[in-house]
Amino acid sequence: SSDTPLMQQWRDAKSRHRDSLLFFRVGDFYELFHGDAEEGARLLGLTLTSRNNGAAAKVPLAGVPAKALDDYLSRLVKLGRRVAICDQVEDPALAKGLVKREVTETVTPGTVLADNLLSERRNNFLVALVGSPDGSHGLAKLDVSTGELSVQRVPEGELRAELGRLEPSEVLLPRALAESPEIAFAAPSTLPRTVRDDWMFEEDIAAAELLKAYSVQSLDGFGFQSHDDALIRAGGALIQYLAEIRPAGVTHLKAVQIRRPGRVMLLDEMTRRNLELIEPLRSGEEGGTLLEVLDGSVTPMGGRLLRRWILEPLVVAEEIWTRQEAVAECVASPELRDALRRALKGVSDLERLAGKIGTLRVGPRDLGSLRNSLESLPAVAEAAGNASSDLTQSLGTDLDCMKDVLELLASAVADDPPAALHDGGVIRTGWSQELDEIRAVRDGARDFIASLQARERERSGISSLKVGFNKVFGYYLEVTKANLDKVPDDFVRKQTLTNGERYFTPELKEWEEKVFGAEDRIGQLEVELFAGVRAQVAGAVPRLQDSGARIAALDVLSAFAHIAVRH
């Protein structure tokens, strides 16, 4: 090939992701080439230019700054597009020849994880469908952001209603089903569809994927029965697709739930619309839905659960009475109601924090948010545990406050951590003796450099001399034009300005190197220490998910009482 090595590397990655726009990391930018560049320029309003390609012709090029990637991904996902992220997977400074690059993630409407791509108060479902000889369908749904996975049989003629209730962001289909009349009728034309070969949906292959995902020898423990082959096929294909999307894997999948008929009422599209459960009868109108009237929840998990309860009303009398008893107690007891809601307001989105931990996307600020949330759990547990209704009491008594995780985060993470790890200042003083010692060296060197200003002013007789710093030139001594005749002989010119000159001295250079050397080591050490803390927290993800589910239920029950009293 006459392509440059970089373009050969791009072609290799693109050949495995033909159905995606390939964002290819080059330095501080993600670049798109050839047809991707032309489409990206059209969809995102990017400038279309070209890149030299050795002996081959120039290739179309468009690019976005790496730090702005999420903004551009958000726009593409909203348009229903798939994006493959090809990252540099080795330090360019250490690379021998071409920097190694790999596709680390594929972002699709049904598998997004970034906060700005998700709605706080609704699930983001990826759905897989398979057909059955009797006309029914096996359906699996997954919210990657929370780890919720469930499978169910959808009777013949009810697929449209079920997809309307779930409002998935993406549907995964076997090739044989993709063009069928029932899919054309049931799935809105605007719903992004991903089609894969039929073998991926075969029962043996799908069952093996489920066994591997949950590290079990048998699926019997989940409650699968002999006639559940369509459920297994849909669930296993969905797991396999997730592995394709996220090669690094996920560790936060909850146990697969098998949804059987009889516990909740399935509402068809006409019923949902006429009752204005979650959207008004006339599109474009605002307000007036049952969801808006009843939503007094104070946590994102509670908001999502309320939406589910409205769309899936219970039909089992005992469960209805249990919920009514819990709400009635909260209505009758302002002390219980207020104590619960006051404590719940301090809890952030535990379910999605668990998802970030399980997909290695958790940042310093996320762990700070988790720590602050865990501090509120004992008050929630105490208030609920003292209730007399069975449901509220059990939710509170069995609530895991995760004291060990709280102690870890309180000891390891700074009070106000930055959003990004590379910004520094993530690890709390006292967590690592080595880190504390290197920070002391850096701070001492900075203090010495700061003291240079007074000493150099006195030595040179230049009262306006300043010590400054910028990221391009490092530390410098700045002298105005009027004082250039007083500059000592050991000042070395560093930069010429309109109104003066910037210099360094051997002494300043020596101390600058101490600061930079310490900062480099601090950055490396914080990355290592943060990874260690994250790994410890990852071991508690199932507990975190269970606590999140309990918090959501307590939130909705107390919100019902709050709305009842208010109206």
Regions found by a protein language model. Give the residues of each.
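Charged catalytic and DNA/RNA-contacting regions of genome-maintenance
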Residues: 1-329, 338, 342-358, 362-454
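Conserved NTPase motor "head" modules and their coupling/switch loops across ABC/AAA+ ATPases, GTPases
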Residues: 1-2, 486, 490, 494, ...
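Long, charged, glycine-rich C-terminal linkers/tails
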Residues: 88, 250-259, 455-468, 562-567
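Intracellular alpha-helical coupling/juxtamembrane segments of multi-pass membrane proteins
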Residues: 320, 343, 347, 445, ...
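Cytosolic, long alpha-helical scaffolding segments
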Residues: 405, 412, 419, 475-491, ...
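Extended, charged coiled-coil "arm/hinge" scaffolds of SMC/Rad50-like chromosome-maintenance ATPases
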Residues: 497, 501-535, 551
